[in-house]
Design a protein with these regions (language model features):
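A detector for short, charged/polar N-terminal pre-domain segments
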Residues: 1-9
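Short amphipathic helical patch at the helix-1/turn junction of helix-turn-helix
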Residues: 8, 19-20, 48
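Short basic helix-loop element that most often maps to the first helix and adjoining turn
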Residues: 12-31, 56, 61
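Residues in the helix-turn-helix
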Residues: 27, 38, 48, 67
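Recognition helix of helix-turn-helix/homeodomain-like DNA-binding domains
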Residues: 32-47
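Short, basic-rich loop-to-helix N-cap that marks the start of a DNA-contacting helix
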Residues: 46-56
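Short C-terminal boundary/hinge segments that cap the last helix of small helical domains
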Residues: 49-51, 62-71
């Protein structure tokens, strides 16, 4: 699996979890100290997500990091 495919899978998983919780992109962005554009980029797999950001996303979505990257 390529890095691009992994980024897209990660983004899709984050988007699905966010939508399950009824969180708008803007609110998730505020929760992790980011902005809506960055959340859109993450969810569409166009940016790399570092460990610190991955941890903040997992905390905000109330899941374990492994739940985001289990692919």
């Amino acid at each position: 699996m390529s890095t691009d495919e992994r980024r897209k899978q990660l983004g899709a998983r984050i988007k699905a979890l966010r939508e399950q919780q009824g969180l708008p992109q803007r609110k998730l962005a505020l929760m992790i100290g980011s902005n809506q554009t960055h959340i859109w980029q993450i969810e569409n797999g166009t940016v790399n997500v570092g460990l610190d950001l991955l941890c903040r996303l997992a905390d905000a979505l109330e899941v374990n990091v492994r739940d985001l990257i289990d692919f």
